[in-house]
């Protein structure tokens, strides 16, 4: 039995952010009913290859990654019959999640204002690119565009290179996780008070929130954050290093670990050097320290360094 056993979720979402959110609710034991277009289904059913072959059928790997623990129902929401069925399901659900553009559910007679009349306890979550209100609210919200507009691409990529998107649709993932936690809080509120609520989750807002220390640094300094490639803006050493047979990743999070590292590589004096003794000093003298470490690490295989660093607890 999961924490959400007995909770019913009505899932009107497609693609990634919404389906991830509802899948996690299903993982916790909720009964998730996924409403799909009666002709084409979720868009991602057609996204491939790769395909999983089973019982003579092909299933999109993309679709499968965020749609476990769900029961699918095909409805034509443009028809009276489809809308009536959706309303009946909503009347007996605890949670509804949708990711149409603002106003999309209202066109089907399924807005929060309409459904709360038949189910006052309903937790109704809307996931969009830019929220229910505001100058950009009518824009579609694709992950790639959100990564660009939020500034995430500006800080991703090589130091002297072009901005890059992250290798997965991270803005979608972040929005789905924010929606999941907001729904749990709203569900708790509904169980205490009997009151449902409408949750407004925007990919843009949640991606801005996920910039965390980079956004804080920019607000405090007033400067546009540069790209650091695989290095860290505020911690040194914290990047890949080239060993004799390839690269390995090294993350030294504090001065104590740096002293351990220096002892391990046979240069305990470096940890007493004023240029490197503290993390702010190491950040200020990043290039000099990285050059010294490169000269040490290139002498042995990557696996040997990784084993030694792990044994030292770094």
Task: Outline where the language-model segments fall.
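Short, well-structured beta-strand/strand-turn elements
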Residues: 32-35, 310-314
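Oxidoreductase and adenylate-handling cofactor-binding alpha/beta cores
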Residues: 176-196, 209-221, 262-269
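Active-site-adjacent beta-strand anchor residues
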Residues: 76, 98, 201-204, 250-252
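Aromatic-enriched alpha-helical interface/lid elements that frame and gate functional surfaces
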Residues: 236-313
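Beta-strand segments within the central parallel beta-sheet cores of soluble alpha/beta enzyme folds
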Residues: 196-204, 308
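N-terminal helix-loop segment corresponding to the beta1-alpha1 unit
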Residues: 1-182, 186-192, 198, 227
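Active-site Gly/Thr loop motif
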Residues: 222-238
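Glycine-rich beta-alpha junction loops
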Residues: 39, 130-131, 203-208, 245, ...
């Amino acid at each position: 039995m999961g924490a959400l056993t007995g909770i019913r979720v009505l899932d009107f979402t497609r693609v990634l952010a919404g389906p991830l959110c509802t899948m996690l609710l299903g993982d916790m034991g909720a009964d998730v009913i996924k409403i799909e277009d009666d002709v084409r289904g979720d868009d991602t059913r057609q996204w491939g290859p790769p395909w999983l072959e089973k019982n003579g059928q092909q299933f999109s790997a993309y679709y499968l990654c965020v749609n476990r623990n769900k029961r699918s129902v095909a409805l034509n929401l443009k028809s009276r019959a489809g809308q009536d069925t959706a309303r009946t399901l909503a009347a007996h659900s605890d949670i509804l999640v949708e990711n149409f553009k603002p106003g999309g559910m209202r066109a089907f007679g399924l807005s929060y204002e309409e459904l709360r009349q038949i189910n006052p306890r309903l937790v109704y979550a809307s996931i969009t690119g830019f929220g229910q209100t505001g100058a950009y609210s009518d824009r579609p919200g694709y992950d790639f565009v959100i990564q660009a507009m939020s500034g995430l691409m500006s800080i991703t990529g090589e130091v002297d290179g072009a901005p890059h998107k992250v290798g997965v649709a991270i803005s979608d993932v972040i929005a789905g996780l924010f929606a999941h936690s907001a729904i749990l809080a709203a569900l708790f509120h509904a169980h205490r008070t009997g009151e449902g609520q409408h949750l407004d989750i925007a990919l843009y807002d949640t991606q801005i929130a996920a910039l965390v220390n980079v956004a804080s640094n920019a607000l405090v300094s007033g400067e546009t954050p540069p790209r650091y490639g695989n290095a860290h803006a505020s911690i040194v050493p914290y990047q890949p290093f080239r060993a004799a047979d390839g690269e390995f990743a090294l993350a030294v999070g504090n001065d104590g670990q740096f002293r351990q590292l220096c002892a391990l590589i046979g240069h305990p004096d470096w940890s007493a050097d004023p240029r490197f003794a503290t993390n702010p000093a190491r950040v200020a003298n990043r290039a000099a320290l990285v050059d010294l470490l490169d000269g040490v690490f290139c002498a042995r295989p990557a696996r040997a360094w990784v084993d030694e660093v792990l044994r030292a607890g770094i």
